[in-house]
């Protein structure tokens, strides 16, 4: 329960940054469990390949392997929640140390608030810390349902794969196999969307924490405007998620058509495309986090050297 509390609670300002976060260990254990599931599916497939009569077992081994990949993604998501906790520890540490490091500066005259340019792109200068950008506020809300629903759908798909293995009627087997694939890959898409929202939550914490530190020093607050990489990240994330939902609907249609093989031939690449788009968005989110960290390093150095 203590580990779960770390997911949603900002640590107190006097929290020891050297402490080991339980949630990180949980994330690593979950990730290793996912690797074990994928390895088990691989071994099972090797045995199935040598037994033509057992080809129907490929249905459940598929379900197990996809469940393994989803479990690895869940482990990544859990570790990211620990990073959010570390981020707030960093904010509190900087708030405590920066006043002692800050150069003495004469009081500023009138300050021209508004848009400014920085080495890391356009920014704004405000008297108070700005609020979160709408996508960041949404990310803080949406990562939890996505991380919850994604594994649930993957497990539903795993159960369907077991029923597919035992189905005697070809039409029933076809329908179950289609729903297995569509359901599991919708769960995979939701998990990647949840990871994307967690990265958005990290960006939200960087924006909020950076403004909080500057405001606590009585300084004008410099905040990056949304970088271009963040805008493309949003496009890719929502595009990939919508495509993941679309493949689920299309697999539902394919479950009852006369020629499912034709549908399966292009639905397979389509579902992989949805995950690829989501992963590309995650790459841009990580790039954006690097940009924001660089900006904050530049701002901290500016405060230390100039006092402003």
Task: Place the predicted regions along the sequence by residue.
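Charge-rich, solvent-exposed alpha-helical interaction surfaces
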Residues: 26, 42, 62, 141, ...
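Membrane-helix interface motif
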Residues: 39-54, 156-172, 245-259
């Amino acid at each position: 329960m203590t580990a779960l509390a770390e997911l949603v609670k900002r640590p107190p300002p006097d929290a020891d940054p050297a402490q080991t976060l339980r949630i990180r260990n949980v994330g690593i254990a979950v990730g290793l469990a996912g690797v074990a599931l994928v390895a088990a599916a691989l071994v099972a497939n090797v045995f199935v390949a040598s037994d033509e009569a057992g080809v129907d077992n490929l249905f459940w081994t598929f379900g197990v392997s996809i469940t393994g990949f989803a479990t690895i993604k869940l482990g990544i998501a859990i570790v990211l929640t620990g990073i959010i906790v570390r981020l707030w520890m960093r904010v509190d540490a900087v708030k405590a140390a920066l006043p002692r490091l800050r150069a003495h500066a004469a009081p500023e005259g009138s300050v021209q608030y508004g848009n400014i340019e920085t080495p890391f792109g356009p920014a704004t200068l405000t008297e108070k810390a700005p609020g979160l950008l709408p996508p960041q506020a949404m990310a803080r809300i949406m990562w939890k349902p996505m991380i919850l629903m994604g594994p649930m759908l993957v497990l539903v798909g795993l159960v369907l794969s077991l029923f597919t293995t035992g189905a005697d009627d070809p039409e029933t087997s076809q329908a179950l196999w289609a729903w297995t694939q569509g359901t599991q890959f919708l769960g995979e898409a939701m998990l990647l969307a949840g990871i994307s929202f967690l990265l958005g939550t990290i960006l939200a914490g960087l924006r909020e924490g950076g403004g909080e530190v500057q405001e606590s020093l009585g300084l004008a607050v410099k905040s990056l405007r949304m970088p271009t990489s963040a805008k493309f990240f949003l496009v890719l994330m929502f595009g990939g998620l919508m495509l993941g939902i679309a493949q689920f609907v299309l697999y539902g249609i394919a479950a009852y058509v006369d020629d499912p093989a034709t549908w399966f031939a292009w639905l397979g690449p389509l579902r992989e495309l949805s995950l690829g788009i989501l992963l590309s968005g995650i790459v841009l989110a990580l790039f954006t986090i690097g940009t924001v960290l660089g900006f904050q390093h530049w701002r901290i150095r500016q405060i230390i050297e100039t006092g402003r």
